[in-house]
Amino acid sequence: MTKEELIEFEQQIADLFNAKQIKSPIHLYHGNEDFIMEVFKEIDIENDWVCCTWRNHYQALLKGIPQNKILDSIVEGKSMVLNFYDHKFISSSIVGGIPSIAAGIAYANKLSNNNSRVWCWVGDMSAETGAFHEAYKFSLYNELPITFVIEDNKKSVCTPTSDAWKRETPYYLNQEYCGEIIRQQNLYYYQYSNDKYPHAGAGKRIQF
């Protein structure tokens, strides 16, 4: 799966949504392709779990799930809740809903000693929730095989995260961001800007 193929897939979903072929909300990626592909170089596609939020198309594609299978689920209205258990891929549309699930899977993996790692994506504002903090802290104290990948687009819907919390550097980072993926124990972090699509939808249809 190339960068161009990722972008093309999201454009296809945007076109279908604007043509009213997709009836449920969608959340599209753009601008993070290089970072997410770099992270996936470390993922064991067959053995590791990938856990996501409502914005999850790129992860599903990079996990090796067939495009037609992903497309069918999105057209059926499941864009925000793509779940393919046979591919060890799950997602949740609840803010702060996926970190504790991911930590639970990682805990089970540790008890089973099956060498499977969990990779859990969350946004920058979701990473400010108590649910994330508890899951992240639990993973550290129990030395769980999990990496939380925080994608920072600097906003929650239309609210700048730094304005909401009155700080530029998030509490969970031990260094300032310099343009590359920050790698800490059980946590990766990178920033990107999506100037192509709005928070939800594809820019032409009113949703909620």
Write out the residue ranges for each language-model feature:
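Conserved internal helical-beta-strand scaffold that buttresses enzyme catalytic cores
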Residues: 1-23, 72-86, 194-196, 200-208
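A short alpha-helix capping/helix-coil boundary motif
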Residues: 2-3, 17, 113-116, 148-151
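Cofactor-binding active-site loop characterized by glycine-rich and histidine/acidic residues
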Residues: 14, 21-142, 163-167
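Intrinsically disordered, low-complexity boundary segments flanking structured domains
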Residues: 13-15, 38, 174-179
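Thiamine diphosphate
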Residues: 142-208
